[in-house]
Every structure is written in structure tokens, then in C-alpha cells.
């Protein structure tokens, strides 16, 4: 171990020390596989780890755009062989203003190529810690919300029951109901929900349908998804319809505004969120709407609202929440057609990666015994 001078801060010191402890086994296997399947590089290539055809992480601008360049698993019956299963839910039929979130899974996958599997601050290398597969997208039905819900529920149910950790790429927030439904059916106890958003999303209907403003009304109608275990973080602004606020008040959900969280401190806010979501629950689902961030950071979303969180506040929240296990995560309302320099898709990718990394660091992933 090298010497550290006094100018290192505690986080930087931890990160640098931790990196030295991480294995490189999977990286070496990836290089060897690339040379075997992609052919050794041309004679003029000095670095003999470089193949002729791009395989694996490098270069970041090349390759097939699965999430984090994870293997594409055509046979979804095998998803239980992996620790994490990524699936897209390309649906924006529940949108009440800007559309385009049907392209969210594509946008997130595309920019995820920019990321490596190693997090400096977390001291985690996902490639060395867990296995990830990209299952592709659920076959959604653009003109039929209810059939799409059935498709999404079946897909999430399949992944969750396999033992893989589901990562769902939305899609508008109407998918929150069918994703929760797909998990809840496999639980003997209750399912809590930690919901990041600027909007309450608790109306019964909107525009006469179960739109992206309604998922938690219907999710908390599921017998083992009680409203007392729904905590909604970041709610505020001029886009919180009164019928939804009324439902939350009557059902006893917990709402935490941005100001609430900032004034009490992110650590205390996360502690409260965990207390509510886990109160008597068997498992907790994380539903992350990118519009919980200030609109300056997420222009590519269906209902942008100024006054939201800063990215570092959200990432700190995620780090604390993932100290406890999660049933899965969904990222919703990422609309690439309205994005600027892919920054909305970028933060969506970061939230997923930090969630996985923190779960690994806390010992919650992989979920299954390797014995």
C-alpha cells in the first residue's frame, strides 16, 4: 500500500485504499474473451489486449447498446442465472403532457455505455461483484394501457420470482402500478414503496384512464401494498393536482417535500423514509421519477418542475436508502426527444448504478447464496 499524505480527505482515502483491494478477475476474463471472439488486434496495435472487433467495455463509443454493455439475454427463461436483470418498459400511453418516454429505455442504454463498472467513491466494481443481463424490452401495446399493464406485470413477476434483482427502465410513471403488482404477488407480507417525484401520482383516474398521475392509487389498492408504507419524496410545485393530494391525505401516505428534506438533512430524511417504507413490510420497491430533480438537470422529461433536488442530494439519498435491501428499482419519465446532451438519461443511469453499487457494498447483492 502506498503512502498517503495529509491532503487526502476521508472519502478519497477510502476510495484509493479500497481500489487496491478489488480483484481484476472478471476484467481479465473479459479481455481474454474479447481476443478470442473478436480476434487479436492488427499487428500495428501495441496494446495486445485490444481485439480487432470491439468486445466488452472499451471503447465506450462503440459496441451494442445494452445497459452497461451487459450481455443481451434472448432466452428470458434463464434470467435467474444472473444477479441483476434489466428490462425496458417502453410505454408512454399514460402520459398527459409530453410524450417520448417510450424511448427512455433506448436513451438510458445508449448513454450507459459512457459508464464503466467501477465507482471511485463507493469502492465497488460491479463487474467483479455481480452478474447483469439485459433482457431487452417488454412488448408493450401503445394503444392499450391495461394490456400493457398486464404485459409489464407478467415480465416483472417473472424476473422477481427467478431470484434476479429487477431494474426496470421506463416508460412513463403509469408503469409503477404494474411493476409493483408483479412483485407483490410473490410476497407473503407487505411491500413498501419509496417514491421519488415532484408529483403525488395518487389520483384514481386522469383523462378518464389510469395515467401516469395514478399509479399509487391503484398500487395501494393491492391488499399487501398498504398506503402507510408509501413514502413520497420531493413532492411540490404547481403540478400536484388536488384530487391526488386528497387521496394521500385520506389514505395516510407520507409526503416529504424538497424543503422538508433539505432542512432536516438528507441523512435524517432518508432515515424517516426507510422507517415508513419498512414499517412491518417484507420488502421495499424503489420508484424513481427523474423529474424529482430540478428541471435544469432533467430537461428530458414529461412534466419538468423547477425547485427539485440537486443531483448530489439525490445520490446521497440513494446511498442511504440502499443500506437496506430493495426488491427492485424502476426509473421512469426519461424522455430522450426533449433531452439536452443526454443529461437526463445520464442521471437516470447514475441512479441505477449507484443503487446497485450501494446494494453491493452493503452486502445485499448478490441476493442468493453461492453455496
For each predicted feature, which ranges?
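Conserved alpha-helical scaffold segments that buttress catalytic/binding sites
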Residues: 2-371
Amino acid at each position: 500500500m502506498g503512502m498517503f499524505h495529509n491532503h487526502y480527505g476521508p472519502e478519497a482515502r477510502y476510495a484509493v485504499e479500497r481500489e487496491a483491494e478489488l480483484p481484476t478477475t472478471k476484467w481479465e476474463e473479459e479481455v481474454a474473451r474479447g481476443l478470442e471472439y473478436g480476434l487479436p488486434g492488427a499487428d500495428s496495435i501495441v496494446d495486445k489486449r485490444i481485439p480487432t472487433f470491439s468486445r466488452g467495455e472499451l471503447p465506450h463509443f462503440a459496441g451494442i447498446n445494452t445497459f452497461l454493455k451487459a450481455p443481451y439475454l434472448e432466452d428470458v427463461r434463464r434470467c435467474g442465472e444472473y444477479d441483476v436483470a434489466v428490462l425496458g418498459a417502453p410505454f408512454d400511453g399514460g402520459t398527459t403532457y409530453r410524450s417520448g418516454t417510450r424511448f427512455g429505455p433506448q436513451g438510458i442504454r445508449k448513454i450507459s455505455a459512457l459508464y464503466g463498472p467501477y465507482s471511485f467513491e463507493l469502492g465497488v466494481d460491479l463487474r467483479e461483484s455481480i452478474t447483469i443481463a439485459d433482457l431487452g424490452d417488454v412488448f408493450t401495446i401503445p394503444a392499450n394501457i391495461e394490456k400493457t399493464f398486464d404485459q409489464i406485470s407478467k415480465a416483472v413477476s417473472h424476473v422477481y420470482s427467478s431470484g434476479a434483482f429487477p431494474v426496470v427502465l421506463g416508460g412513463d410513471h403509469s408503469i409503477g402500478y404494474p411493476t409493483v403488482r408483479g412483485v407483490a404477488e410473490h410476497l407473503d407480507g407487505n411491500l413498501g414503496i419509496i417514491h421519488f417525484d415532484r408529483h403525488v401520482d395518487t389520483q384514481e383516474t386522469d383523462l378518464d384512464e389510469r395515467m401516469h398521475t395514478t399509479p399509487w392509487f391503484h398500487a395501494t389498492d393491492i391488499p399487501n401494498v398498504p398506503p402507510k408504507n408509501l413514502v413520497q419524496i420531493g413532492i411540490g410545485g404547481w403540478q400536484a393536482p388536488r384530487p391526488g393530494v386528497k387521496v394521500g391525505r385520506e389514505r395516510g401516505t407520507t409526503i416529504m417535500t424538497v424543503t422538508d428534506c433539505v432542512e432536516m438533512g438528507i441523512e435524517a430524511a432518508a432515515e424517516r423514509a426507510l422507517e415508513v417504507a419498512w414499517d412491518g413490510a417484507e420488502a421495499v420497491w424503489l420508484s424513481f421519477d427523474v423529474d424529482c430533480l430540478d428541471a435544469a438537470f432533467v430537461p428530458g422529461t414529461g412534466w419538468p418542475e423547477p425547485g427539485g433536488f440537486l443531483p448530489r442530494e439525490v445520490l446521497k439519498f440513494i446511498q442511504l436508502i440502499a443500506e437496506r435491501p430493495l426488491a427492485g428499482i424502476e426509473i421512469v419519465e426519461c424522455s430522450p426527444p426533449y433531452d439536452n446532451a443526454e443529461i437526463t438519461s445520464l442521471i437516470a443511469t447514475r441512479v441505477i448504478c449507484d443503487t446497485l453499487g450501494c446494494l453491493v457494498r452493503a452486502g445485499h447483492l448478490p441476493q442468493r447464496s453461492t453455496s
